[in-house]
Amino acid sequence: MVSCTDDDDKEPNFMPPDIVMGGGDVESEYPEDLPAPGASVMYTPSLNANMYRPISVKYSSAYPPISSWKTENTRIIAYMDGYKPAIKTLKAYQESVNKYGSSTTLPKQAATGRFYTKKIDGRWWLVDPEGCLHLERSATSLRKGTSSRNKTAWNSRFGTDEKWLSTTQRELSEIGFHGTGAFCTGTYSLIQTHNASNPSSPLTLAPSFAFLSQFKSAKSYSYPGGSDDNAAGLVFYNGWSEWCESYLAGSAFADYLRDPNVLGFFSDNEINFSSNSSRILDRFLAISNSSDPAYVAAKAFMDSKGTQSVTDDLNNEFAGIVAEKYYKAVKEAVKKVDDKLLYLGTRLHGTPKYMEGVVRAAGKYCDVISINYYSRWSPELTTAIADWANWADKPFLVSEFYTKGVEDSDLNNQSGAGYSVPTQNERAYAYQHFTLGLLEAKNCIGWHWFKYQDDDGTDNSSKPANKGLYDNSYQLFPYLSFFARELNFNAYDLIQYFDK
C-alpha cells in the first residue's frame, strides 16, 4: 500500500491529509474526514434523472482574505445513488487502458496512427492512434518552476530531465492523467525526447501558439487602433491567410507535424471577440484611422445593415465574421500542411464562448472547440453546453479549469480565474463535481486541468496561486490526487452509466 504521506522529500512544513491510495491490486481507502451528505435529491442541472446525496462546499470568486463564502451542493462519486466504481485499483485501471489512457474495453475503431474525432451513437469521442476510444485527461503548463525552492526541489528529486519526465509521466498516469496541454514552455521538445525513448509510456502533447501576435511581428504591423484588445482585427490585414500557411509549414510546427503523440494544437489563447464591457464592433468602429482594415471592415458591415447603432445581435454577427475569417485561414493551412493534425481552436473564454456567431465559426473550421471554463461551479448542461452542440456539430474540450485552496496554502492566492475554496479537500470535491458534469455531456471529449504545478515566487507579478496538481516541492497534492484518480479511473464506466 502506497501512502502519499510517506515521502521523505516532502517540504518540511507541508502537512498533507491522511490519504491512502492503493498500489497494484490494493484498493484505495476513503479518507476519514469525508463530509456527511444530505438527503438524496435529483442532480440539477442535468441531462439525466440521476439521484445523489449532495455535500455542501464553500467557494468564492474573490481573493483572500475571503469575507463571504457562497455554498453550493456538490456531487462526488461516493454519494451517487445507484453507482459503484467499477475500477478500484491501479492494477485494474492499467488493465483497462492502453498507453494513452484510452479504453481497451469499448469498441475499437479504425486505427490511423493519429488522433481523430468521431461521433458514435450521439456521443463525441477522440480516437487514439491505435483505434481506441479516448477521453482526454491532461494537465497544462508542464514546465520547471523558476523559484529558488522549485530549483532546489527539482535538483533533489530529479536532477535530470529524463528522470523528471519519466517520474512525472508515471505519477500522472497512476492517477489517470496521460498528457499535457497548453503552455508547456521549454518542455515540448523534452517531452518528445521522453516519448522517443519511452514509446510505451508517452505523454501526449497539445502545443499552444500565438498566431495573431506572430503575424503582427512577422509583418511589422501594429495592433488595430494600437490596442492588443483588437488583435482579432489583424485578420483583415494583408497576408493573413498566406502567412498562416507559411507559419504552419515552418520551423515552429516542424517537430509536431505527423507526430502520433500530438493530440492537436491551439492557435491562440482567449482571443477577445468581445467581453461584458467591450463589444468588438464598437471597438473597431472607434479606431481613429479610417484606413485601418479593421475599421474598414466594421464600417462596411454597419453600412450593409443600414444603421449606425450597434446592438448585441449585430455585434454577435460581426464577431462571427471575424472569427470565421480567423479560423478558416488556420484550418485551410492545416489541411495543406498536415491534414491529420487536429485543430483544437483558440481556448474560448468569458463572453466569446457564449456568442453564437463565434462558436458557429469555430465549429465550422475547428476539429474541437476548446473552452477555458471558469466562473461556473457546475457545467451548464442544459444551457451553454446544449447551445454549443446546437451551434456547432463538433465536440468541445475544456482546455482550462481549476480551483485554489486558500486556507491551507502558503501562497498569497491573489491571482487567477479559478474559484477560491477553503482547503485542498474542497479542491478535490470540486474536481469530481465539475468533471462528472462534463461526463454527462455527449459533446465533451475531455479536459485539461490548469495546471501541472502551483505558482511560486514572482509568478503572476508576485501573486502566486494554488493551481497545481503538484506543490512547489514537486509532490502531488494527496487529497486532490485521490479524488481525481477515482474519477479518472472510472471515467469510461461513468460515461456508460450516464448514457444508459
Predicted features by range, described:
Residues 2-34:
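Bacterial Sec-dependent N-terminal signal peptides
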Residues 50-199, 214-264, 309, 313-316, ...:
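Active-site-adjacent substrate/metal-binding segments within catalytic domains
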Residues 217-233, 310-312, 350, 355, ...:
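Active-site clefts of carbohydrate-active enzymes
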Residues 192-229, 260-263, 267-304, 457-472:
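Aromatic- and acidic-residue-enriched segments that line the glycan-binding/catalytic groove
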Residues 282-291, 450-500:
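Aromatic-rich peripheral "rim/lid" segments of glycoside hydrolase catalytic domains that contact
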Residues 129, 228-235, 258-357:
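Polysaccharide-binding and catalytic clefts of secreted carbohydrate-active enzymes
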Residues 317-332, 336-416, 436:
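Glycoside hydrolase catalytic-domain groove-lining segments
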Residues 47, 181, 260-264, 268-270, ...:
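Substrate-binding cleft of secreted/luminal carbohydrate-active enzymes
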